[in-house]
Regions:
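C-terminal segment of classical bacterial N-terminal signal peptides
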Residues: 15-23
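Non-cytosolic coordination micro-motifs
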Residues: 24-75, 114-215
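Mid-chain, structured segments of secreted extracytoplasmic proteins
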Residues: 71-121
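Positively charged, low-complexity intrinsically disordered regions
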Residues: 4, 19, 85-88
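Bacterial N-terminal signal peptides that target proteins for export
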Residues: 1-12
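Generic hydrophobic-segment detector
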Residues: 2-3, 33, 106, 110, ...
Length: 215
């Protein structure tokens, strides 16, 4: 039976997943001193980044421009601030499930500044993930918010676009920001169906940006 054709059941399932995500996310204090992803931490030098455990290095601006490793970060084009964006994934030989963040297939981008230090990290749920996994993608944002402390977030809700419809009775366009321990965080969550999408197609995503906070 296709759940997407049963809005009530689908909505109940989404709410249940959301409750589980919140319940299983550990509480955090309003200071954060851990790594931001695995062994990656904002501010660390690029030459300190571990090569083992990571694969598929490429320039985010042109993913056909492959890199041998972190050490080749200067081969990618810099933006106006001198920051270079490196796409990467997890080595399947050490990460059996592939590039996953908190159980969600993810697209990862590391930002390195012109001094050779990690300036930021971007995490996006993978839109090519299988449907049964992808329809939980909006929950990753809840897990990210809990990781950095549930308090102190400033959130806003976007207005529906022309013809946009809820999915399973839920419409979500949320953007939340927070600054903590020298990190500027942005968590965006979307769940809706555009007018050009059929019953099995919809927007369901989380985008997370972790940058060094400006003084």
């Amino acid at each position: 039976m296709d759940r997407l054709k049963l809005p009530g059941m689908f909505a109940a399932g989404l709410l249940a997943w959301q409750a589980v995500a919140l319940a299983n996310s550990p509480a955090r204090t309003e200071e954060f001193s851990g790594n931001n992803l695995r062994d990656i931490r904002l501010g660390m030098a690029a030459n300190e980044l571990a090569e083992a455990g990571y694969v598929d290095f490429a320039c985010a601006a042109d993913t056909k421009h492959a890199l041998a490793g972190w050490k080749n970060w200067r081969d990618c084009p810099a933006d106006a601030s001198g920051t270079r964006a490196i796409r990467f994934g997890y080595d399947p030989s050490t990460s059996r499930d592939g590039t996953m963040v908190a159980g969600h297939p993810a697209i990862l981008t590391l930002l390195i500044d012109d001094t050779g230090h990690v300036a930021g990290l971007q995490i996006e749920t993978d839109p090519k993930a299988r449907l049964y996994i992808r329809k939980k993608a909006f929950l990753l944002g809840l897990q990210a918010k809990s990781r950095y402390g549930s308090d102190g977030w400033a959130c806003s809700e976007g207005r529906p676009g022309a013809g946009d419809q809820p999915v399973g009775g839920i419409y979500l366009k949320e953007r939340c920001t927070k600054t903590i321990s020298g990190r500027s965080l942005v968590v965006e969550r979307n769940l809706f169906r555009r007018p050009d999408q059929d019953s099995k197609s919809f927007v369901d995503e989380t985008r997370i940006s972790i940058l060094r906070a400006k003084n």
